[in-house]
Amino acid sequence: MAIVKEITADLIKKSGEKISAGQSTKSEVGTKTYTAQFPTGRASGNDTTEDFQVTDLYKNGLLFTAYNMSSRDSGSLRSMRSNYSSSSSSILRTARNTISSTVSKLSNGLISNNNSGTISKSPIANILLPRSKSDVDTSSHRFNDVQESLISRGGGTATGVLSNIASTAVFGALESITQGIMADNNEQIYTTARSMYGGAENRTKVFTWDLTPRSTEDLMAIINIYQYFNYFSYGETGKSQYAAEIKGYLDDWYRSTLIEPLSPEDAAKNKTLFEKMTSSLTNVLVVSNPTVWMVKNFGATSKFDGKTEIFGPCQIQSIRFDKTPNGNFNGLAIAPNLPSTFTLEITMREIITLNRASLYAGTF
C-alpha cells in the first residue's frame, strides 16, 4: 500500500539536496558583452521550411566582434588574427544547421583561450548583420624609387667616383662634358630608376547597409547597432600611465647616480630640482582606444566564395548613419518621424599590414 503524506512546509524543506552540496562550475564574466542583430531573431532563424531563400537569408551575414586589447605590438596583433581565424572556423562550420547554438558560442568569445594576457577573455560586442551592400576587397602596395648613378655612388660628388690622382687629372674635362658639351650635342646622362617593393598598405573596407525595420524590435536593433559602433569607435582620454612610469625611472636613476653618492647620509634626497623638471610627465594627457574589431563572414560558404578571409584586427575610421525622414508617416507608427529605411555606412581600417604568411592565416 502506498503511503500518502501531506505536503507541508517542513516536508518541502527536507526534500531535494542542500544548496551547499555543490556549486556551479561556471565562473562569473567580468566583461559585459553587448549583442545586437538585424533583423531581430536572425540568429535563431533556423527555419524548418523548405524555402531555400528563407534559410539562406538567416544563415549568411557578417559578424563583427570587438575585443579590448592592451598590447599593440606586431607579434600580438598577427597572432590574434591567426588565432581568431583558426578558432572561429570550427565554430562557424556548425552554422549550417544550428544557428542559435553557434551564436551562443560566439557570445562567449571566439578566442577566449588564446592570448589571455593581452586580449580580453570575453568580447565586448557581438553584432550580426546581413551581407554588406558594398563588398569590395582592395589591396594596395607601396614602392620606393631607387635611383643610382656614378655620382651617387661616389658620395654625391664627381671626384668621389675616381681616385684622388685620377680625379685631379680628369675632373676638368669631366665637368665640362657633363655641363655643356653633351647638351650641345642633344644628349643627356641617362640614369636608370628602379622601383623596389616597400610593403603592403593598411587595408580599408567600407560596409554599407540599407536597413528597413519591419517591427518595433527591428527599429530598436538598428538604433542599438549604430550606438554600439559609434561608442566603441571613440577613445578614452586620461593621464598617461607610461609617462608616469618614465618619470619614476628617471627620478630613481638621478637619485641613485648623482644625489646619493654626493650627498651626506642625513641630507634630504627627495624633492630635487630634477624631480621638479620631470613633474610635467605626470600630467601628460593621452587618448587610448583599446577596442579592436574582427570581421568575418558568418554562415554557410562554398568553394565559390574563395578562401575564408577575415578582416582585422581593425578599428573604425568613420561612421555615417542616415536617418533623414523621407516624408511624413513613412516609418513605423510608433516612430513616425523616423525614416522607413536607414542607411548605415562604416569604414574600417586594419591596424597592421599583412604579408603572405598572415593574409590567409597560412592556408594558401
Curated annotation (Swiss-Prot):
Give the source's domain of life in one word: Viruses
**Where does it live in the cell?**
Virion
**GO terms for cellular component:** virus tail, baseplate
Entry keyword Glycosyltransferase: no
> What GO terms in the biological process aspect are recorded for it?
viral tail assembly
Q: Which Pfam families match?
A: T4_tail_cap (PF11091)
Q: What triggers or suppresses the expression of this protein? A: Expressed in the late phase of the viral replicative cycle.
- Name the principal localization, coarsely classed: virion
List keywords of the entry alphabetically. Answer: Late protein, Viral baseplate protein, Viral release from host cell, Viral tail assembly, Viral tail protein, Virion
Record function comment:
Baseplate protein that forms, together with gp54, the baseplate-tail tube junction. The tail tube first 2 annuli are formed by gp48 and gp54, which are in continuation of the spike complex. Involved in the tail assembly. Morphogenesis of the baseplate is completed by association of gp48 and gp54, which bind the upper part of the baseplate dome to form the platform for polymerization of the tail tube.
**Assembly information from the UniProt record:** Homohexamer. The tube first annulus is composed of a gp48 hexameric ring. Interacts with gp54. Part of the baseplate macromolecular complex which consists of gp5, gp5.4, gp27 (central spike complex); gp6, gp25, gp53 (inner baseplate); gp7, gp8 (intermediate baseplate); gp9, gp10, gp11, gp12 (peripheral); gp48 and gp54 (proximal region of the tail tube).
Supply the name of the protein.
Baseplate tail-tube junction protein gp48
The UniProt gene name for this protein comes to 48
